[in-house]
């Protein structure tokens, strides 16, 4: 673990997150916001650890604009801005919800306080379920529901999701014990809906899985580029749109996904179309507390 690089990635992610909050205004193209955020990451000396997620209202996660996307921010939209930065594979992951052109409300406060509650109980020796319990209690006592099938995650070098999850609810079997040096992203999601997300089209974010022989020439070209430029970190459909005509790109991605060479992350929507709020920080676990790298 390189604490210095983790801290630097966190510092960049924080700056970008705070700037994005100011940029998000009614009438702004979502595509323009995404491109501004990712450009800022590069200008500050980092690289995107994943495409910026800009998910509005009942969309909980995995929406990132595509070239030609005409989505415009409207006053009152609940916009979740989820930013990932890496330096040499050391990742910071942070998110905030803004209510476009309006003040924070109780739903947003519930997700934010759930994050604070989880951070306050986290330290070496604590079981993951205690964090889930803190998150669930904080959200439910305010009259909202945690999203049961979304969770925080362990982070390793060049690995955004490293196999251990921090759920948004108390689950008795979540007995992984936090260890000194562990890096985790904690990300409570609160909703006025049913508390569950489902996958819906489109798929705008993908990740390389493994090399697979494929017949389609464009698919072979694309897989080589994906592996070379993004490695094991997620990438956006948008980042590939200049590489080949739309029809060819869609076919190549479909071919690679079907072959198991890449994995697609469909957009996640609250099952009853309930508004969703999210807040997230990355932590490094210490003996008696944690370092929040993105604060």
From Swiss-Prot:
Textual note on the cofactor: Binds 2 divalent metal cations per subunit. Has a high-affinity and a low affinity metal-binding site. The true nature of the physiological cofactor is under debate. The enzyme is active with cobalt, zinc, manganese or divalent iron ions. Most likely, methionine aminopeptidases function as mononuclear Fe(2+)-metalloproteases under physiological conditions, and the catalytically relevant metal-binding site has been assigned to the histidine-containing high-affinity site.
GO MF annotation: an example: metal ion binding
GO annotation, biological process: proteolysis
Binding residue positions for a divalent metal cation 1: 82, 93, 280
InterPro entries, per database record: Creatinase/aminopeptidase-like, Met_Aminopeptidase_Type2, MetAP_archaeal, Pept_M24, Pept_M24_MAP, Pept_M24A_MAP2, Pept_M24A_MAP2_BS, WH-like_DNA-bd_sf
Residue sites binding a divalent metal cation 2 per the record: 93, 153, 187, 280
GO cellular component, one term: cytoplasm
Keywords, ordered alphabetically: Aminopeptidase, Hydrolase, Metal-binding, Protease
PANTHER family per the UniProt record, alphabetical: METHIONINE AMINOPEPTIDASE 2 (PTHR45777:SF2)
Function as written in the Swiss-Prot or TrEMBL entry: Removes the N-terminal methionine from nascent proteins. The N-terminal methionine is often cleaved when the second residue in the primary sequence is small and uncharged (Met-Ala-, Cys, Gly, Pro, Ser, Thr, or Val).
Protein name per the record: Methionine aminopeptidase
Gene: map
């Amino acid at each position: 673990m390189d604490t210095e690089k983790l801290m630097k990635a966190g510092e960049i992610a924080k700056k970008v997150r705070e700037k994005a909050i100011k940029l998000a205004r009614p009438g702004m193209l979502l595509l323009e916001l995404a491109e501004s955020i990712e450009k800022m990451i590069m200008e500050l000396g980092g690289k995107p650890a994943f495409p910026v997620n800009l998910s509005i209202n009942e969309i909980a996660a995995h929406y990132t604009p595509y070239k030609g996307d005409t989505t415009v921010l409207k006053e009152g939209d609940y916009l979740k801005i989820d930013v990932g930065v890496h330096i040499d594979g050391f990742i910071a992951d942070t998110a905030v919800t803004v209510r476009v052109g309006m003040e924070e409300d109780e739903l947003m406060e519930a997700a934010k306080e759930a994050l604070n509650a989880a951070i306050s109980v986290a330290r070496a020796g604590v079981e993951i379920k205690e964090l889930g319990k803190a998150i669930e209690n904080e959200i439910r006592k305010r009259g909202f529901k945690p999203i049961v099938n979304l969770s925080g995650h362990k982070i390793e070098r060049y690995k955004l999701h490293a196999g251990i999850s921090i759920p948004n609810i108390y689950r008795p079997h979540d007995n992984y014990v936090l260890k000194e040096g562990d890096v985790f992203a904690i990300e409570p999601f609160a909703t006025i809906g049913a508390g569950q997300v489902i996958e819906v089209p489109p798929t705008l974010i993908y990740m390389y899985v493994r090399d697979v022989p494929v017949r389609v020439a464009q698919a072979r070209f694309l897989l080589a580029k994906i592996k070379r430029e993004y490695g094991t970190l997620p990438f956006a459909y948008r980042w590939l749109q200049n590489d080949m005509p739309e029809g060819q790109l869609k076919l190549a991605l479909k071919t690679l996904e079907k072959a198991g060479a890449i994995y697609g992350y469909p957009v996640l929507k609250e099952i009853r179309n309930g508004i969703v709020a999210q807040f997230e920080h990355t932590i490094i676990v210490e003996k008696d507390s944690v370092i929040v790298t993105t604060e």
